[in-house]
Design a protein with these regions (language model features):
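A conserved mid-protein helix/loop that constitutes part of the nucleotide-sugar donor-binding site
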Residues: 13-24, 186, 190-212, 219, ...
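Aromatic "clamp/platform" in nucleotide-sugar-dependent glycosyltransferases that forms part
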Residues: 249, 268
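Carbohydrate-associated surface elements
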Residues: 140, 161
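A short helix/loop element that forms part of the nucleotide-sugar donor recognition site in Leloir-type
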Residues: 167-181, 236, 350
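Conserved acidic donor-binding segment of nucleotide-sugar-dependent glycosyltransferases
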Residues: 300-301, 305-312, 321-327
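A conserved, positively charged/aromatic
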Residues: 102-139
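A short, well-ordered alpha-helix in the C-terminal region of glycosyltransferases
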Residues: 314, 321, 328-343, 352-355
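Short hydrophobic beta-strand element within catalytic cores of glycosyltransferases
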Residues: 35-37, 285-288, 298
């Protein structure tokens, strides 16, 4: 099975990590896989030297030049599957396939990792009509696609997976020393892009409530994005400069997870949340909202605590409960690690994805 994978992002987030895990997993399973991505992007920088790579990214969603270059590559390479991992990639692949004169075209698979509705404009409707199969990161995402009119037979759920070997090999970050934190101060962590739907504003508001009861608690937010100035202002307004740290983009997120005492996902919308998987694989107890597919990962009361989105008080109460109960933290952390090992490995995700490929390639 030869699959060609398209990701047009220049930055590195959970989606790009899943692309790389999928591509490398296909190769490890003995299948050919090629990556089409931004020539100057973070994904290319992190890809193995020996990986088949085509530097190509559309400047706009209707970049006919990029689509033409892709169509020529498809004609030459003749992949069985084209797996587009973002909306611009879907558009470029759909345009490229429409230019093909081959009697049998490659099957188009679209990854869907966000719990947003499909856009209703003409271009969006056209490009998604060309998709042979949607691979959804959660059942919550699949339900949204079905509500948008996608036939049930065209959408399948494949939960994301993580490389457990990388998790085991990551050293623990020395955050107390790096940020000059008080000895023994518990650390509550959040790893996500600083964008509105990740809900870090609620995380900071909850921190203000937590420190009233656990004054030595510290909060580390790893990520960058448009929300940074807003969060900086909020932290100052709430007098939390000594308690909340904006750590910026970090390539060592697994090491960070191992240094956290509690991991919090404050999203107001979320496809699945691979940061949850990373944290659970590192044995961290979770506080997460019920947004999107997160309840498919976090078992409330067993591997973590689920709270309603946008509820600062509920978020704070859950954090306080865990910070005050070490035995509960250890029990939930161990249960989360066991769950990820059993159900959310990269090998399982790759095998399920390959099964989707094989099912549509035979048609």
């Amino acid at each position: 099975m030869f699959s060609l994978h398209i990701d047009t992002a220049r930055t590195w987030r959970g989606g790009q990590n899943q692309v790389l895990v999928t591509v490398m997993g296909m190769r490890s399973a003995g299948h050919r896989a090629m990556l089409v991505a931004h020539g100057d992007g973070e994904l290319r920088r992190r890809a193995d030297e020996g990986l088949d790579f085509l530097p190509l990214a559309p400047r706009t969603e209707m970049d006919l030049s990029a689509a033409w270059r892709l169509s020529r590559a498809i004609k030459q390479l003749r992949p069985d599957i084209i797996h587009a991992h973002d909306p611009h990639g879907v558009a470029m692949a759909a345009l490229a396939l429409s230019m093909s004169t081959q009697p049998k075209r490659a099957k188009l698979v679209a990854a869907r990792r966000v719990d947003f509705r499909l856009k209703g404009n003409a271009l969006s409707r056209w490009k998604y009509d060309q998709v042979d199969r949607f691979i959804c990161a959660s059942d919550a995402i699949r339900k949204i696609l079905l509500a948008d009119g996608v036939a049930p037979s065209r959408a399948v759920t494949v939960h994301e997976g993580i490389d457990l070997g990388h998790v085991a090999a990551a050293p623990r970050a020395a955050l107390h020393e790096e940020f000059w934190l008080p000895h023994g101060a518990p650390i509550v962590g959040n790893v996500a892009a600083l964008v509105p739907h990740k809900g870090q504003r609620h995380f900071v508001e909850a921190a203000a409530l937590v420190v009233r009861e656990v004054p030595d608690a510290r909060f580390v937010i790893a990520g960058e994005g448009e929300l940074r100035p807003t969060l900086e202002h909020l932290i100052k307004h709430l007098n939390l400069e000594k308690h909340v740290i904006l750590a910026g983009f970090r390539p060592d997120v697994l090491s960070l997870h191992k240094a956290f005492d509690v991991f919090v996902m404050s999203s107001v919308t979320e496809g699945l949340g691979t940061s949850l998987l990373d944290a659970m694989a590192c044995g961290r107890p979770i506080v997460a909202t019920t947004a999107g597919g997160m309840p498919e990962v976090v078992q409330d009361g067993r591997t973590g605590i689920l709270v309603p989105p946008r509820s600062d008080r509920a978020l704070a109460d859950a954090i306080i409960k865990l910070l005050k109960d070490e035995a509960l933290r250890e029990r939930m952390g161990a249960a989360g690690m066991s769950l990820v090992n059993a159900k959310f490995s990269a090998e399982r995700m790759v095998a399920d994805t390959l099964s989707v490929y094989e099912g549509i390639a035979r048609r």
